[in-house]
Amino acid sequence: MSNPKQEQHLSQDLLRIITATHHDPFEVLGRHSLPVPTATADTLVRVYLPGARSAELVINRQNRQIAPLNRLPGTDFFEWYGLGQQLPVHYQIEWYDRHNQHRVHYDPYAFAPQLGELDMHLFAEGQHWNIYNLLGAHPRQVDGINGVLFATWAPNAERISVVGNFNDWDGRHHPMRVRGSSGLWELFIPGVQPGDLYKFEIRNRQTGAVFLKSDPYGQSFEHRPSTSSIITADSAFAWQDADWMEHRAHWDWQASPLSIYEVHLGSWRRGWAGEFLSYRELAHQLADYVKYMGFTHVEILPVSEHPLDDSWGYQTTGYYAPTSRFGSPDDFRYFVDHLHQQGIGIILDWVPAHFPKDAHALARFDGSALYEHEDPRLGEHRDWGTLIYNYGRSEVRNFLLANALFWLKEYHIDGLRVDAVASMLHLDYSRQPGEWIPNIHGGNENLEAMTFLQQLNAICHGQHSGALVIAEESTAWPQVTRPTWVGGLGFSMKWNMGWMHDTLEYMSREPVHRQYHHNQLTFGMMYAFTENFQLPFSHDEVVHGKGSMINKMPGDDWQKFANLRLLYTYLYTYPGSKLLFMGGEFAQWSEWAHGRSLDWHLLDYGPHQGVQSAVKDLNHLYRQVPSLYQRNFRGDGFEWIDCHDSTQSIISYIRSSDSEFTLVILNFTPVPRYNYRIGVPVAGQYQEVFNSDSQFYGGSNLGNANPLYTQPVPWMNHGQSLEVTLPPLGGLLLKLA
């Protein structure tokens, strides 16, 4: 126990160790050569052991060479003076704490720095793509001794200590060393093991405030509401998805079917008692269902660690850790691996736009605005109560860019859906005049965010061929999906929010009124090929009072289900990749609720079975018929037959591939149409390959069971035409027999 009177005679360095304010404890602790050696002593070993009753220096345990460590009077410093040649490079300290508990460990202050100069330089430049292998907590062997290297970035800290269940959460035991002006702090602690809990105790240089922070680069965390990071061993998981990864590296995604099932893992399905399913349980159940339904990919709402269930994962605190709600990091690897083995891709919802203000996480990490902007006009998103990243800071960009690569490389994720891109690109996003700061040119474009996104896409596509990066971007920002070398942002695809809103608004209208809003169906084709669009019926459309997909539809129950089947027929035949949120595929009545399972019991009822069967058949048809996907992002893959029949609320068009085509006719009224004529490009016999009004889907079964033969009657710029029967609120797909 330290004695204040004795402390008055100590050097400033020793006092700073006692007061836990020293920036480099290696200057004081560990092994040091004496400035004036003698015949019996040329070396000093000094350790600081708060609460120690006694301590000894283990020189050679096998030969029982143990020397006493003498307490510096009135302090918890212990010292040994002797000849350095007697000591091994790494000696052990054996001591008893105030509770008489015996402790033995190697001296952490006898190890050389571990972070290399090149590593620190690349990080300062914002270009260390494997920085997650250095920063954080990493088990490693140094000089043959097992331990854990801890490292973090906190340039405005006066002192940082590693605290955990291995040192009684006492910041005096393991203060870290700062590496010059890099802002990086590190300490190798021998004997600490995977599974141990830890945090960083940080003292701010300006204010002297001391606080605990979880590890920004932590790869595992305690189950909420606890917030400690968990030391995680290097994974020995044996991946079995080599065939999938090889295929992904060479696939032409722009000419391939892409049908995405959007899933929230915590509420897709739960156990009998309402508990979460594990990653491994979800892997099998979800893969079986997705294969049955015919989706090509699963997109999961953010799986990175987050403290609040209500945020759905969008307020991330552990960017490098799969949430512990469903299991361990290797359990999540199993989830990905199993889906890949079943031929299913995985897209991860990723949130680089903002982060929460939780005191244990990134917010004011070292007591200053480190990851965020100091000025709230740049650094705060008031709508969401979150903070905005400072993309102009190299180390912040590196944190995010390396994180994107981390998921693609370490977890074999097939793509990232980047959340809230519009909020990143616009300095005045959701702000009134005077609440934002213009860029250097006086505009509202966030030039630093733009550069960040271009760099994100360049490195993701450059290092992981075939990986997708998809933007949720809700404005008219130009060239979102155009290559970075022509000035675009470089995304693979962009959500088509305009088409989605127009379509849902149109479908929500009573059919008798639809004729007056026909342009909501046709306008989207004016810009359909200006970007690589994805058509999203996402989670955002079935929450907060917007109603479920089935409840958006007008009419009685029969008409609601018919409208929904028609809507999905439109989705699967319109140019662009597809995305459908869970529950919509079987017409769940209620809005999505993250705290419980989907209403799977509805599949006991025919109408819900019918919608599910229609979606399943549309998925499989979409994957089997090249004209429905091969030119999804090309204007020559779509041709209107008739977009002008607003009076009857009917549209018809042709989808084309390199070798065949499909006719699509959609009737948006409950009135059957007989002998409805459409022009066709090729004479011959046509047959119905899909009818959303089929009895198998719960419809009235009106359609064209017999083959249809063209007539030499010119119609709508085509020399041949067909007379077809259109079912009420129904969609037809026809092909040459």
From Swiss-Prot:
This is 1,4-alpha-glucan branching enzyme GlgB. It comes from Cellvibrio japonicus (strain Ueda107). Catalyzes the formation of the alpha-1,6-glucosidic linkages in glycogen by scission of a 1,4-alpha-linked oligosaccharide from growing alpha-1,4-glucan chains and the subsequent attachment of the oligosaccharide to the alpha-1,6 position. Disulfide bonds: none annotated. Monomer. PANTHER family: 1,4-ALPHA-GLUCAN-BRANCHING ENZYME. Keywords: Carbohydrate metabolism, Glycogen biosynthesis, Glycogen metabolism, Glycosyltransferase, Transferase. InterPro entries: A-amylase/branching_C, Branching_enzy, GlgB, GlgB_N, GlgB_N_E_set_prok, Glyco_hydro_13_cat_dom, Glyco_hydro_13_N, Glyco_hydro_b.
